[in-house]
Amino acid sequence: MFFVERFILKKLLSWKNSPYRKPLILKGVRQVGKTWILKEFGRRYYENTAYFNFDENEEYKQFFETTKDVDRILQNLMLASGQKIVPEKTLIIFDEVQDCPKVINSMKYFCENAPQYHVACAGSLLGIALAKPSSFPVGKVNFMQIDPMTFNEFLLANGDENLAQYLEQVDSLEPIPDAFFNPLYEKLKMYYVTGGMPESVLMWTEARDISAMQEALSGIIGAYERDFAKHPHLSEFPKISMIWKSIPSQLAKENKKFIYKVVKEGARAREYEDALQWLVDARLVHKIYRSSAPGLPIAAYDDLSAFKIYLVDVGLLRRLAQLAPTAFGEGNRLFTEFKGALSENFVLQTLITQFEVMPRYWSQNNPPYEVDFLIQRENDIFPVEVKSETNTSSKSMKKFKELFPDKVKLRIRFSLDNLKLDDDVLNIPLFMADQADQLIGLALEKMEH
Protein backbone atom coordinates (compact mmCIF):
# COMPACT_ATOMS: atom_id res chain seq x y z
CA MET A 1 0.00 0.00 0.00
CA PHE A 2 1.41 3.38 -1.00
CA PHE A 3 1.69 6.47 1.17
CA VAL A 4 -1.33 8.69 0.98
CA GLU A 5 -2.79 11.22 3.36
CA ARG A 6 -6.13 9.85 4.52
CA PHE A 7 -8.34 12.16 6.49
CA ILE A 8 -9.39 9.38 8.88
CA LEU A 9 -5.93 9.63 10.51
CA LYS A 10 -7.14 12.80 12.27
CA LYS A 11 -10.12 10.90 13.68
CA LEU A 12 -7.84 8.09 14.85
CA LEU A 13 -5.60 10.61 16.61
CA SER A 14 -8.64 12.08 18.40
CA TRP A 15 -9.54 8.54 19.51
CA LYS A 16 -6.00 7.99 20.86
CA ASN A 17 -6.07 11.24 22.84
CA SER A 18 -9.64 10.96 24.12
CA PRO A 19 -10.05 10.58 27.90
CA TYR A 20 -13.11 8.42 27.10
CA ARG A 21 -11.27 6.11 24.68
CA LYS A 22 -12.63 2.56 24.40
CA PRO A 23 -11.35 -0.30 22.22
CA LEU A 24 -11.88 0.63 18.57
CA ILE A 25 -13.71 -1.34 15.92
CA LEU A 26 -12.80 -0.09 12.44
CA LYS A 27 -15.39 -1.05 9.85
CA GLY A 28 -15.00 -0.90 6.09
CA VAL A 29 -15.33 -3.11 3.03
CA ARG A 30 -12.61 -5.49 1.93
CA GLN A 31 -9.57 -3.72 0.40
CA VAL A 32 -10.63 -0.22 1.43
CA GLY A 33 -7.37 0.19 3.41
CA LYS A 34 -8.26 -0.76 7.02
CA THR A 35 -5.06 -2.68 7.80
CA TRP A 36 -2.83 -0.11 6.12
CA ILE A 37 -4.40 2.82 7.93
CA LEU A 38 -4.08 1.17 11.36
CA LYS A 39 -0.44 0.20 10.76
CA GLU A 40 0.33 3.70 9.44
CA PHE A 41 -1.41 5.21 12.48
CA GLY A 42 0.67 2.97 14.79
CA ARG A 43 3.87 3.88 12.95
CA ARG A 44 3.20 7.61 13.26
CA TYR A 45 1.84 7.93 16.77
CA TYR A 46 3.02 4.97 18.89
CA GLU A 47 6.39 3.62 19.98
CA ASN A 48 5.52 0.27 18.45
CA THR A 49 2.66 -1.71 16.94
CA ALA A 50 1.70 -5.28 17.81
CA TYR A 51 -0.21 -6.80 14.89
CA PHE A 52 -2.24 -10.02 15.10
CA ASN A 53 -4.06 -11.45 12.09
CA PHE A 54 -6.65 -14.10 12.98
CA ASP A 55 -6.94 -15.34 9.40
CA GLU A 56 -3.23 -16.08 9.13
CA ASN A 57 -2.83 -17.29 12.73
CA GLU A 58 -6.02 -19.09 13.67
CA GLU A 59 -4.26 -20.56 16.72
CA TYR A 60 -4.36 -17.11 18.38
CA LYS A 61 -8.13 -17.48 18.76
CA GLN A 62 -7.56 -20.09 21.48
CA PHE A 63 -6.10 -17.51 23.86
CA PHE A 64 -9.48 -15.77 23.95
CA GLU A 65 -11.47 -18.96 24.46
CA THR A 66 -9.86 -20.08 27.70
CA THR A 67 -9.80 -16.87 29.77
CA LYS A 68 -11.29 -13.41 30.20
CA ASP A 69 -8.12 -12.14 31.85
CA VAL A 70 -6.68 -9.45 29.56
CA ASP A 71 -3.13 -9.68 30.97
CA ARG A 72 -3.05 -13.41 30.41
CA ILE A 73 -4.39 -13.07 26.85
CA LEU A 74 -1.71 -10.48 26.03
CA GLN A 75 1.03 -12.53 27.74
CA ASN A 76 0.14 -15.51 25.53
CA LEU A 77 0.01 -13.37 22.38
CA MET A 78 3.42 -11.84 23.16
CA LEU A 79 5.02 -15.23 23.79
CA ALA A 80 3.48 -16.81 20.69
CA SER A 81 4.36 -13.95 18.35
CA GLY A 82 7.53 -12.48 19.83
CA GLN A 83 6.01 -8.98 19.77
CA LYS A 84 6.15 -6.67 22.78
CA ILE A 85 3.15 -4.83 24.20
CA VAL A 86 3.57 -1.85 26.54
CA PRO A 87 0.52 -0.09 28.04
CA GLU A 88 -0.12 3.38 26.51
CA LYS A 89 2.91 2.99 24.18
CA THR A 90 1.82 0.15 21.88
CA LEU A 91 -1.01 0.09 19.38
CA ILE A 92 -2.48 -3.42 19.46
CA ILE A 93 -4.15 -4.36 16.15
CA PHE A 94 -6.47 -7.36 15.94
CA ASP A 95 -7.12 -7.93 12.24
CA GLU A 96 -9.66 -10.14 10.43
CA VAL A 97 -11.80 -10.50 13.55
CA GLN A 98 -15.08 -10.97 11.68
CA ASP A 99 -15.12 -14.74 12.40
CA CYS A 100 -13.87 -14.40 15.99
CA PRO A 101 -16.84 -13.61 18.25
CA LYS A 102 -14.70 -14.31 21.35
CA VAL A 103 -12.14 -11.71 20.27
CA ILE A 104 -14.86 -9.13 19.61
CA ASN A 105 -16.49 -9.96 22.93
CA SER A 106 -13.17 -9.64 24.81
CA MET A 107 -13.26 -5.91 24.02
CA LYS A 108 -15.61 -5.65 26.98
CA TYR A 109 -12.80 -6.79 29.32
CA PHE A 110 -10.25 -4.54 27.65
CA CYS A 111 -12.63 -1.64 28.18
CA GLU A 112 -13.55 -2.42 31.80
CA ASN A 113 -10.36 -3.92 33.21
CA ALA A 114 -7.48 -2.74 31.01
CA PRO A 115 -8.14 0.74 29.56
CA GLN A 116 -4.36 1.37 29.55
CA TYR A 117 -4.06 -0.78 26.41
CA HIS A 118 -4.84 0.87 23.07
CA VAL A 119 -6.66 -1.75 21.00
CA ALA A 120 -8.05 -1.49 17.47
CA CYS A 121 -9.93 -4.29 15.69
CA ALA A 122 -10.57 -4.53 11.97
CA GLY A 123 -12.23 -6.98 9.65
CA SER A 124 -14.17 -7.06 6.44
CA LEU A 125 -17.83 -8.08 6.64
CA LEU A 126 -17.85 -6.86 10.24
CA GLY A 127 -21.25 -5.34 9.52
CA ILE A 128 -22.54 -8.89 9.05
CA ALA A 129 -20.94 -10.13 12.28
CA LEU A 130 -22.27 -7.14 14.22
CA ALA A 131 -25.80 -7.58 12.85
CA LYS A 132 -25.94 -10.79 14.95
CA PRO A 133 -26.03 -9.48 18.50
CA SER A 134 -25.14 -12.87 20.10
CA SER A 135 -22.79 -11.56 22.80
CA PHE A 136 -21.69 -8.21 21.57
CA PRO A 137 -19.90 -5.77 23.92
CA VAL A 138 -22.62 -3.10 23.74
CA GLY A 139 -21.39 0.31 24.90
CA LYS A 140 -17.85 -0.98 25.44
CA VAL A 141 -16.32 -0.05 22.08
CA ASN A 142 -15.88 2.95 19.78
CA PHE A 143 -16.82 2.46 16.13
CA MET A 144 -15.22 4.12 13.15
CA GLN A 145 -15.99 3.70 9.47
CA ILE A 146 -13.40 3.91 6.70
CA ASP A 147 -14.84 4.61 3.26
CA PRO A 148 -13.21 4.66 -0.18
CA MET A 149 -10.82 7.56 -0.80
CA THR A 150 -12.62 10.85 -1.39
CA PHE A 151 -11.95 12.97 -4.46
CA ASN A 152 -9.77 15.27 -2.31
CA GLU A 153 -7.73 12.29 -1.10
CA PHE A 154 -7.44 11.15 -4.72
CA LEU A 155 -6.04 14.59 -5.67
CA LEU A 156 -3.42 14.33 -2.91
CA ALA A 157 -2.45 10.81 -4.01
CA ASN A 158 -2.22 12.03 -7.60
CA GLY A 159 0.27 14.77 -6.70
CA ASP A 160 -2.29 17.56 -7.16
CA GLU A 161 -1.78 19.12 -3.72
CA ASN A 162 -2.33 22.59 -5.22
CA LEU A 163 -5.85 21.67 -6.41
CA ALA A 164 -6.70 19.88 -3.16
CA GLN A 165 -5.46 22.87 -1.19
CA TYR A 166 -7.48 25.26 -3.34
CA LEU A 167 -10.68 23.28 -2.65
CA GLU A 168 -9.92 23.11 1.08
CA GLN A 169 -9.59 26.88 1.39
CA VAL A 170 -12.63 28.05 -0.60
CA ASP A 171 -14.45 30.36 1.81
CA SER A 172 -16.90 32.25 -0.40
CA LEU A 173 -19.44 31.47 -3.12
CA GLU A 174 -17.48 33.27 -5.85
CA PRO A 175 -17.24 31.38 -9.18
CA ILE A 176 -14.18 29.12 -9.45
CA PRO A 177 -11.57 30.59 -11.87
CA ASP A 178 -10.97 28.60 -15.09
CA ALA A 179 -7.37 27.90 -14.04
CA PHE A 180 -8.80 25.61 -11.33
CA PHE A 181 -12.22 24.78 -12.79
CA ASN A 182 -11.00 23.05 -15.96
CA PRO A 183 -8.27 20.83 -14.46
CA LEU A 184 -10.58 19.86 -11.58
CA TYR A 185 -13.18 18.55 -14.05
CA GLU A 186 -10.55 16.51 -15.87
CA LYS A 187 -9.33 15.03 -12.56
CA LEU A 188 -12.92 14.25 -11.51
CA LYS A 189 -13.43 12.25 -14.71
CA MET A 190 -10.33 10.26 -13.83
CA TYR A 191 -11.70 9.69 -10.34
CA TYR A 192 -14.91 8.30 -11.87
CA VAL A 193 -12.67 5.83 -13.71
CA THR A 194 -10.46 4.72 -10.79
CA GLY A 195 -12.91 5.23 -7.93
CA GLY A 196 -11.53 5.48 -4.41
CA MET A 197 -10.34 1.93 -3.71
CA PRO A 198 -6.66 2.41 -2.76
CA GLU A 199 -5.27 -0.35 -4.99
CA SER A 200 -7.05 1.03 -8.05
CA VAL A 201 -5.92 4.58 -7.25
CA LEU A 202 -2.35 3.33 -6.78
CA MET A 203 -2.25 1.73 -10.23
CA TRP A 204 -3.23 5.05 -11.75
CA THR A 205 -1.35 7.57 -9.58
CA GLU A 206 1.92 5.62 -9.28
CA ALA A 207 2.07 3.74 -12.56
CA ARG A 208 -0.46 5.45 -14.87
CA ASP A 209 -1.35 1.90 -15.86
CA ILE A 210 -4.97 1.69 -17.04
CA SER A 211 -5.04 -2.07 -17.59
CA ALA A 212 -3.52 -2.75 -14.14
CA MET A 213 -6.16 -0.43 -12.67
CA GLN A 214 -8.93 -2.32 -14.49
CA GLU A 215 -7.48 -5.59 -13.15
CA ALA A 216 -7.32 -4.20 -9.62
CA LEU A 217 -11.03 -3.30 -9.78
CA SER A 218 -11.91 -6.70 -11.26
CA GLY A 219 -9.92 -8.35 -8.48
CA ILE A 220 -11.80 -6.42 -5.81
CA ILE A 221 -15.17 -7.26 -7.39
CA GLY A 222 -14.07 -10.92 -7.56
CA ALA A 223 -13.15 -10.88 -3.86
CA TYR A 224 -16.58 -9.44 -2.99
CA GLU A 225 -18.31 -12.06 -5.11
CA ARG A 226 -16.39 -14.81 -3.29
CA ASP A 227 -17.57 -13.26 -0.01
CA PHE A 228 -21.20 -13.76 -1.08
CA ALA A 229 -20.64 -17.48 -0.55
CA LYS A 230 -20.01 -16.75 3.14
CA HIS A 231 -23.72 -16.21 3.72
CA PRO A 232 -24.76 -18.80 6.34
CA HIS A 233 -27.56 -20.05 4.06
CA LEU A 234 -26.01 -21.23 0.84
CA SER A 235 -29.32 -20.78 -1.01
CA GLU A 236 -28.89 -17.00 -0.60
CA PHE A 237 -25.57 -16.95 -2.46
CA PRO A 238 -26.98 -16.87 -6.03
CA LYS A 239 -29.59 -14.27 -4.97
CA ILE A 240 -26.94 -11.94 -3.53
CA SER A 241 -24.95 -12.35 -6.72
CA MET A 242 -27.96 -11.57 -8.93
CA ILE A 243 -28.87 -8.43 -6.96
CA TRP A 244 -25.25 -7.23 -7.09
CA LYS A 245 -25.04 -7.74 -10.85
CA SER A 246 -28.40 -5.99 -11.39
CA ILE A 247 -27.28 -2.70 -9.81
CA PRO A 248 -25.98 -1.06 -13.03
CA SER A 249 -29.29 -1.92 -14.75
CA GLN A 250 -31.26 -0.55 -11.78
CA LEU A 251 -29.37 2.75 -12.03
CA ALA A 252 -29.63 2.94 -15.82
CA LYS A 253 -33.42 3.38 -15.58
CA GLU A 254 -35.02 6.83 -15.77
CA ASN A 255 -36.67 6.07 -12.44
CA LYS A 256 -33.89 4.58 -10.32
CA LYS A 257 -36.16 2.97 -7.73
CA PHE A 258 -34.98 -0.58 -7.03
CA ILE A 259 -37.23 -3.13 -8.74
CA TYR A 260 -36.93 -6.82 -7.90
CA LYS A 261 -38.01 -7.99 -11.33
CA VAL A 262 -34.90 -6.33 -12.82
CA VAL A 263 -32.97 -8.88 -10.71
CA LYS A 264 -34.96 -11.78 -12.13
CA GLU A 265 -38.23 -11.96 -14.02
CA GLY A 266 -41.00 -12.74 -11.52
CA ALA A 267 -38.77 -12.11 -8.47
CA ARG A 268 -40.61 -11.08 -5.32
CA ALA A 269 -39.41 -8.88 -2.49
CA ARG A 270 -39.84 -11.51 0.20
CA GLU A 271 -37.60 -14.01 -1.64
CA TYR A 272 -34.78 -11.49 -2.09
CA GLU A 273 -35.03 -9.25 1.00
CA ASP A 274 -32.51 -11.22 3.06
CA ALA A 275 -29.99 -11.30 0.23
CA LEU A 276 -30.30 -7.54 -0.23
CA GLN A 277 -29.99 -6.94 3.52
CA TRP A 278 -26.76 -8.95 3.52
CA LEU A 279 -25.27 -6.54 0.94
CA VAL A 280 -26.47 -3.56 3.00
CA ASP A 281 -25.02 -4.98 6.25
CA ALA A 282 -21.74 -5.68 4.44
CA ARG A 283 -21.92 -2.01 3.35
CA LEU A 284 -21.19 -3.03 -0.22
CA VAL A 285 -24.32 -1.13 -1.17
CA HIS A 286 -26.12 1.92 0.20
CA LYS A 287 -29.90 1.71 0.54
CA ILE A 288 -31.69 5.06 0.25
CA TYR A 289 -35.37 5.13 1.24
CA ARG A 290 -38.04 7.26 -0.35
CA SER A 291 -39.29 9.96 2.00
CA SER A 292 -42.91 11.09 1.86
CA ALA A 293 -42.13 14.61 3.18
CA PRO A 294 -39.21 16.70 4.47
CA GLY A 295 -40.11 16.35 8.17
CA LEU A 296 -38.03 15.66 11.28
CA PRO A 297 -36.88 13.14 12.25
CA ILE A 298 -36.40 12.21 8.62
CA ALA A 299 -36.74 8.47 9.36
CA ALA A 300 -40.35 8.98 10.50
CA TYR A 301 -41.32 9.73 6.88
CA ASP A 302 -39.67 6.69 5.28
CA ASP A 303 -41.65 4.69 2.76
CA LEU A 304 -40.03 1.31 3.40
CA SER A 305 -41.40 -0.20 0.20
CA ALA A 306 -39.53 2.24 -2.08
CA PHE A 307 -35.75 2.66 -2.14
CA LYS A 308 -32.75 3.09 -4.41
CA ILE A 309 -29.53 1.07 -4.21
CA TYR A 310 -26.09 2.53 -4.91
CA LEU A 311 -22.64 0.96 -4.82
CA VAL A 312 -19.98 1.59 -2.18
CA ASP A 313 -17.65 3.12 -4.79
CA VAL A 314 -18.06 4.94 -8.11
CA GLY A 315 -15.08 3.16 -9.72
CA LEU A 316 -16.51 -0.24 -8.81
CA LEU A 317 -19.85 0.83 -10.31
CA ARG A 318 -18.14 1.85 -13.55
CA ARG A 319 -16.27 -1.49 -13.65
CA LEU A 320 -19.37 -3.54 -12.80
CA ALA A 321 -21.29 -1.69 -15.53
CA GLN A 322 -18.45 -2.57 -17.95
CA LEU A 323 -18.05 1.04 -18.98
CA ALA A 324 -14.62 1.28 -20.62
CA PRO A 325 -12.11 3.73 -19.11
CA THR A 326 -11.71 5.28 -22.58
CA ALA A 327 -14.95 7.19 -21.88
CA PHE A 328 -12.61 9.43 -19.87
CA GLY A 329 -11.40 11.05 -23.08
CA GLU A 330 -14.85 11.52 -24.60
CA GLY A 331 -16.07 14.92 -23.39
CA ASN A 332 -18.83 14.64 -20.79
CA ARG A 333 -19.64 11.04 -21.54
CA LEU A 334 -18.71 9.79 -18.06
CA PHE A 335 -21.17 12.27 -16.57
CA THR A 336 -24.06 11.53 -18.94
CA GLU A 337 -23.59 7.76 -19.48
CA PHE A 338 -26.31 5.59 -18.04
CA LYS A 339 -28.54 8.44 -16.92
CA GLY A 340 -25.84 10.16 -14.89
CA ALA A 341 -25.67 7.23 -12.45
CA LEU A 342 -21.93 7.64 -11.83
CA SER A 343 -22.47 11.24 -10.71
CA GLU A 344 -25.35 10.26 -8.43
CA ASN A 345 -23.31 7.46 -6.90
CA PHE A 346 -20.34 9.79 -6.41
CA VAL A 347 -22.45 12.54 -4.80
CA LEU A 348 -24.16 10.06 -2.49
CA GLN A 349 -20.78 8.71 -1.32
CA THR A 350 -19.61 12.19 -0.32
CA LEU A 351 -22.94 13.08 1.35
CA ILE A 352 -22.73 9.92 3.47
CA THR A 353 -19.28 10.89 4.75
CA GLN A 354 -20.31 14.49 5.51
CA PHE A 355 -23.76 14.15 7.09
CA GLU A 356 -24.63 12.01 10.06
CA VAL A 357 -28.09 10.98 8.87
CA MET A 358 -28.34 8.69 5.84
CA PRO A 359 -29.78 10.66 2.88
CA ARG A 360 -33.26 9.85 1.52
CA TYR A 361 -34.94 10.72 -1.78
CA TRP A 362 -38.38 12.08 -2.64
CA SER A 363 -40.72 11.23 -5.50
CA GLN A 364 -44.36 11.29 -6.50
CA ASN A 365 -46.28 9.75 -9.39
CA ASN A 366 -48.76 11.19 -11.89
CA PRO A 367 -47.18 13.37 -13.06
CA PRO A 368 -43.81 11.89 -12.06
CA TYR A 369 -41.43 14.07 -10.03
CA GLU A 370 -38.24 12.99 -8.28
CA VAL A 371 -35.67 14.77 -6.11
CA ASP A 372 -32.46 12.71 -6.13
CA PHE A 373 -31.60 13.09 -2.43
CA LEU A 374 -32.81 14.74 0.76
CA ILE A 375 -30.16 15.52 3.33
CA GLN A 376 -30.57 16.45 6.97
CA ARG A 377 -28.13 19.06 8.27
CA GLU A 378 -28.71 19.94 11.91
CA ASN A 379 -32.48 20.65 12.00
CA ASP A 380 -32.91 21.44 8.33
CA ILE A 381 -33.72 19.20 5.41
CA PHE A 382 -32.45 20.18 1.98
CA PRO A 383 -33.46 18.77 -1.41
CA VAL A 384 -30.48 17.79 -3.56
CA GLU A 385 -30.37 17.28 -7.27
CA VAL A 386 -27.55 15.82 -9.34
CA LYS A 387 -27.38 17.03 -12.92
CA SER A 388 -24.87 15.64 -15.36
CA GLU A 389 -25.24 18.38 -17.93
CA THR A 390 -24.87 22.16 -17.80
CA ASN A 391 -27.70 24.73 -17.75
CA THR A 392 -30.29 22.46 -16.24
CA SER A 393 -33.49 23.74 -14.78
CA SER A 394 -35.50 21.34 -12.72
CA LYS A 395 -39.23 20.80 -12.59
CA SER A 396 -38.93 18.42 -9.64
CA MET A 397 -37.10 20.90 -7.42
CA LYS A 398 -39.72 23.56 -8.26
CA LYS A 399 -42.54 21.15 -7.48
CA PHE A 400 -40.90 20.17 -4.19
CA LYS A 401 -40.71 23.82 -3.15
CA GLU A 402 -44.36 24.41 -4.13
CA LEU A 403 -45.47 21.46 -2.02
CA PHE A 404 -43.30 22.25 1.03
CA PRO A 405 -42.70 26.04 0.90
CA ASP A 406 -42.00 26.44 4.64
CA LYS A 407 -39.62 23.51 4.80
CA VAL A 408 -37.20 24.49 2.04
CA LYS A 409 -34.64 27.13 3.02
CA LEU A 410 -32.20 26.17 0.31
CA ARG A 411 -32.17 23.90 -2.73
CA ILE A 412 -28.90 22.27 -3.74
CA ARG A 413 -27.84 21.28 -7.21
CA PHE A 414 -24.65 19.45 -8.15
CA SER A 415 -23.83 19.98 -11.82
CA LEU A 416 -21.15 20.85 -14.37
CA ASP A 417 -21.92 24.56 -13.85
CA ASN A 418 -19.81 26.91 -11.75
CA LEU A 419 -20.29 27.65 -8.06
CA LYS A 420 -23.10 30.14 -7.48
CA LEU A 421 -26.01 31.00 -5.22
CA ASP A 422 -28.98 32.00 -7.34
CA ASP A 423 -31.92 33.06 -5.18
CA ASP A 424 -32.41 29.92 -3.03
CA VAL A 425 -30.60 27.50 -5.38
CA LEU A 426 -26.98 26.71 -4.54
CA ASN A 427 -25.17 25.27 -7.54
CA ILE A 428 -22.13 23.22 -6.52
CA PRO A 429 -19.73 21.99 -9.22
CA LEU A 430 -19.50 18.19 -8.98
CA PHE A 431 -15.79 18.39 -8.14
CA MET A 432 -16.67 20.33 -4.97
CA ALA A 433 -19.02 17.67 -3.62
CA ASP A 434 -16.63 16.93 -0.72
CA GLN A 435 -17.10 20.56 0.41
CA ALA A 436 -20.93 20.45 0.33
CA ASP A 437 -21.43 20.86 4.08
CA GLN A 438 -19.18 23.92 4.24
CA LEU A 439 -20.72 25.48 1.09
CA ILE A 440 -24.26 25.00 2.44
CA GLY A 441 -23.13 26.81 5.61
CA LEU A 442 -21.79 29.72 3.51
CA ALA A 443 -25.03 29.89 1.49
CA LEU A 444 -27.26 29.97 4.59
CA GLU A 445 -25.10 32.71 6.11
CA LYS A 446 -25.29 34.77 2.94
CA MET A 447 -29.08 34.36 2.72
CA GLU A 448 -29.54 35.50 6.33
CA HIS A 449 -27.65 38.72 5.59
Give, region by region, the residue ranges found by the protein language model.
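Interdomain hinge/linker elements that couple catalytic modules in large macromolecular machines
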Residues: L156-Q349, T353, P359-N366
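Short regulatory helix/loop adjacent to the ATP-binding pocket of P-loop NTPases
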Residues: G127-F143, L155-D160
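Structural recognition of the conserved hydrophobic beta-strand(s) that form the central parallel beta-sheet
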Residues: I93, H118-S124, Q145
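A cross-kingdom feature that marks ATP-driven nucleic-acid transaction machinery
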Residues: F2, K16-L24, Q31, E40-R44, ...
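Conserved lysine of the Walker
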Residues: K34
